Amino acid sequence: ADRAHGGVRPVMPERAALVGAARVSIARGSKSFAAASTLFAAAVRERAWLLYAWCRACDDLVDGQDHGGERVAVTDAQRRVTRVRALSVAALAGAATGDPAFDALGVVAAETRMPPRYVHDLIDGFQLDADDWRPADEDDLYRYCYHVAGAVGCMMAIVMGVPPEEEATLDRACDLGLAFQLANIARG
């Protein structure tokens, strides 16, 4: 039995249900990402939605938001990151988590042979935020940008079909993630 779910183990939803929930998530959370995803072939588009749903759910859980909306005061950031990490680890192991966004991670990771390190690296970025960590120098800034965006660039490249072994291509995808995050910081 599973105490976190009232003694009942969650059942893995059908892939189509996860894709449907992920499609709703991206449509609600990011009109620009949703529009851009229409340029992909169906299989890549669905995987992009699955990855987005997980990233959005993690960010919202840690920040106390709903699809990037108004924040609520978060007094338990460490517990929230611990929960994100536990659900993500379970999803990567192929277990049903009881949360469609985390189950979506399990599906997209299995379908693409996603290296778990990128998932953990993004979660480490959430940990930096939970710790209220601030960069002290340029190297720290790049470190932060890697964790919150570069790792996502790598995961998105894999979703788009880059084999996980193609480090040079993944390095360029990481650079794009860093550039997006630096632009976000400069805009803010």
Residue ranges and their predicted role:
Residues 2-186:
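Acidic catalytic motifs of isoprenoid enzymes
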